Every structure is written in C-alpha cells, then in structure tokens.
Amino acid sequence: MSDKCGHCDCADKSQCVKKGTSYGVVIVDAEKSHFEMAEEVGYEENDGKCKCTTGCSCAGCNCGK
C-alpha cells in the first residue's frame, strides 16, 4: 500500500477529503416528494483504520494490512 489513505481524494494536497459512493433516493408521494441522500464511505483499502493528516498521508494505521 502507498503512503496515501485510500479513502482520501488527494488531487488537492491542501485538503484531505473523504471519498465515498453516494446514492440518491427519490420518494414520491401523492401529495409531496422529497430527495434523500445517503453516503457510503469506502474503507476497503485500509480496513477503516487509517486517519488522514492534512498532507493526506496515512497516520497511525496499517493501511491494507
């Protein structure tokens, strides 16, 4: 595994943003409708043990181990 957290988008090194899969659900009722958003954050690469530092490096974890 690299020194980068698997769940961070490090295109911009000044910030570390969690990546995930977003699902949108539209619920339609006879009188109203609304949109609900759910997010599933992917921790497959690092088993959820990684913490991202401001430089997007992996700190205090065993990424992918």
UniProtKB/Swiss-Prot annotation:
Molecular function GO terms recorded: copper ion binding; zinc ion binding
One annotated GO biological process: intracellular copper ion homeostasis
UniProt KW keywords: Metal-binding, Metal-thiolate cluster
Record family assignment: Belongs to the metallothionein superfamily. Type 15 family.
Job of this protein: Metallothioneins have a high content of cysteine residues that bind various heavy metals.
Protein name: Metallothionein-like protein 3B
Designated gene of the protein: MT3B
